Every structure is written in C-alpha cells, then in structure tokens.
C-alpha cells in the first residue's frame, strides 16, 4: 500500500481529487448491483461538482483486480444506459441516488489487472487455478458461467467496447496467477 500512498500524494499535490467508493459485494448481490453503485457514486460527484470543486467533465476511475473489472466496465459502458444481447436487456445506469439528472459516464480508466472477458478467463491461463475463481465469477452472475453465456458476456467489459470508449491505462503483472495477463492483452 505504500506505493498507493505515494501516488495519491503526487496526485493531490497536482490538484487532483481522490474519492474512494464502496459497492455491494457479489457475495450479497449479483450483477449489475455493483455497477449501479459505482454509477450512482459518479452521478453524486457530478451532481455536487461545484461544492466539491470537481470537474464533472474529467472523471477517471481506477481499480485493482475485481475493482479493475468495475473500472473497466465503467469505461466500456460509458455513453450507454441500456444494452441488449441475445434478447436479454440490461440497465447499465441504474436508478440509485438523488442525482438521476446526471450520468455515470467516466472519461478515462486506470485498470490494474482487472478481468475483462469472464468467458475467456480459463482459456488463456498458464496456471491451473482452484475452483474458487470460477466460484467468484459465478457469484457475480448468480449461476455457473458455462450455463449463463449471455449473462457472462453482459458482465464482461469487452462486450461494450466501441470507438467511443474512453482511454485506458492498463497495468498487469506477467506472473499474475489470479487474473491471467491475457485479460489485459484483450484490452490492448
């Protein structure tokens, strides 16, 4: 955590504002609850931008591992409120909070080793992992990955990438055994 503190200090010295946010866990709530929570936090920041001295036109999200997944999802889904895949529609924005006149769009993403294509997590893995990783993905979507292909695609940030996707800065260690490096290579 020391490197995070140092980076945060440098950002603060250069007039950046840092906000940490909580979201519902996949142990208690399935997708898209987590996305709705983060989008609500972004809307709150935009709705209170004057009081908080925030530029609502330059909001960057950052996350590590599962937080990287959320950050990547936030960037990839920016500009989209609903999405339909194979007849299943998903509300990407949600309706939490008091600032529904704002949107949850972000303008850049810093993704630290976040999974971006949950369907391909095991296909490009050099190391065989215990079942717990499958279980984490299954918790997120509320069922087995193999039996929920459409929902697995809907929870994967790569599904939403297009020419309007904001810029990404991606970090990933080549020896990561939890999230295979191919997940970041997919974004590159």
Region spans (language model):
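Alpha/beta-hydrolase superfamily serine-hydrolase fold, recognizing
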Residues: 1-188
């Amino acid at each position: 955590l020391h490197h995070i503190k140092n980076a945060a200090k440098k950002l603060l010295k250069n007039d950046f504002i840092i906000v940490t946010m909580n979201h519902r866990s996949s142990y208690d709530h399935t997708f898209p609850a987590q996305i709705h929570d983060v989008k609500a936090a972004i809307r709150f920041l935009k709705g209170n931008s004057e009081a908080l001295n925030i530029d609502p036109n330059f909001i960057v999200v950052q996350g590590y591992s599962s937080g990287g997944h959320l950050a990547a999802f936030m960037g990839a889904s920016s500009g989209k409120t609903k999405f339909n895949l194979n007849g299943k529609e998903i509300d990407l924005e949600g309706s939490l909070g008091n600032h529904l006149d704002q949107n949850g769009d972000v303008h850049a993403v810093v993704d630290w080793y976040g999974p971006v294509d949950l369907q391909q997590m095991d296909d490009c893995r050099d190391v065989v992992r215990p079942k717990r990783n499958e279980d984490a993905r299954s918790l997120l979507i509320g069922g087995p990955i193999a039996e929920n292909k459409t929902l697995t695609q809907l929870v994967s940030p790569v599904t939403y990438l297009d020419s309007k996707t904001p810029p990404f800065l991606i970090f990933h260690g080549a020896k990561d055994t939890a999230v295979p490096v191919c997940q970041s290579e997919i974004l590159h």
